[in-house]
UniProtKB/Swiss-Prot annotation:
Ca(2+) 3 binds at D158, N160, D162, R164, E169. Keywords: Calcium, Metal-binding, Repeat. Transmembrane segments: none annotated. GO terms for molecular function: calcium ion binding; calcium ion sensor activity. It comes from Arabidopsis thaliana (Mouse-ear cress). Ca(2+) 2 binds at D120, D122, D124, E131. This is Probable calcium-binding protein CML43. Calcium-binding protein that may mediate calcium-dependent signal during plant defense response. Induction: In leaves by infection with the bacterial pathogen P.syringae. The keyword Calcium applies. The gene is CML43. Expressed specifically in roots. The lineage of its organism: Eukaryota, Viridiplantae, Streptophyta, Embryophyta, Tracheophyta.
Amino acid sequence: MEINNEKKKLSRQSSSFRLRSPSLNALRLHRVFDLFDKNNDGFITVEELSQALSRLGLDADFSDLKSTVDSFIKPDKTGLRFDDFAALHKTLDESFFGGEGSCCDGSPESDLEEAFNVFDEDGDGFISAVELQKVLKKLGLPEAGEIEQVEKMIVSVDSNHDGRVDFFEFKNMMQTVVVPS
């Protein structure tokens, strides 16, 4: 992949979607790996990665993607194992964003703001049910199927009952999420 052209493409896209180490810890990276590994065989093939990126609106030239990914696949393997995927992520982070903390200060607050902005697609400061549904669909999650289900998700977080989630409601929700150890 030609890095300069890819940097230009990424800089034109929303700054809310980044492959940054501070906001994507090992647990989150495992979740991404599992989402991309469509057949659950423990490997991400170039085809699976290409499809996942396309669902996220990040279309990449297949031959460039294959060339890059192939350099991380171990001999006699059909795709990226998690460790290979993590190494690819780290290399892309360093190449495109200058490594850890280059874009934001890496504080929990800025990480939450960045995560919020992924869902707030129109930038109005609120997450609507339609915006949440779009992101869930891009991620291939079944919860995106019915707008009524997505609206229930919004209502469960919407403490001021205005039908949408603002940053403070999002932050409160994220701070109450328990991550299994």
